[in-house]
Amino acid sequence: RLLTKLAASTGVVTQMGNQGASGEGTDLVCEWIWNGEIGEVTKVECATDRPIWPQGLNAPEKADRIPNTLNWDLFTGPAKLNPYNNVYHPWNWRGWWDYGTGALGDMACHILHQPFRALKLGYPTKVEGSSTLLLSACAPQAQHVKMIFPARDNMPKVALPEVEVHWYDGGMMPE
């Protein structure tokens, strides 16, 4: 919300790219929903097989030798400069709070894109979450997030009532 307000107040054009938006699938889902072909949507459930990298770990206790091909300081950027460890790089940085956002941050922008666009969702009015053990350094191994979005202005062929959107990762699945 802060970034949305900042972009509006400064006139800076912002855009979040999503490769899933370039295929016809998203347009078809929007067309079906906007034409009322599946009726009013009141619940959406989205899931991923991620993480496919380690999560739910404590921070490593020892440092590893930094590979000659890696500028660890440059990679770390403005994040906390932890001692280098092979558990962070390559690829696995996604699961560590200092560098990534876990499976939710890595995949939800792609998977939830269609429902957000097709259902014209804004900000949720209520969010509930549950997860496996949550540690301070690393995202949990699995989580479920439930978001409630208020009713939106009806479209010509379909109403947009309050909707419940669920996110599942790490093996947590709908009941």
PLM ranges: what are they?
Residues 8, 32-35, 62-63:
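Short, hinge-like loop/turn segments at secondary-structure boundaries
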Residues 2-5, 22-33, 52-58:
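Pocket-flanking alpha-helical
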Residues 1-22, 36:
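Beta-strand-loop-alpha-helix segment that lines the small-molecule cofactor/substrate pocket
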Residues 28, 40, 45-100, 105-175:
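Contiguous beta-strand/loop segments that form the cofactor/metal-binding neighborhood of enzyme cores
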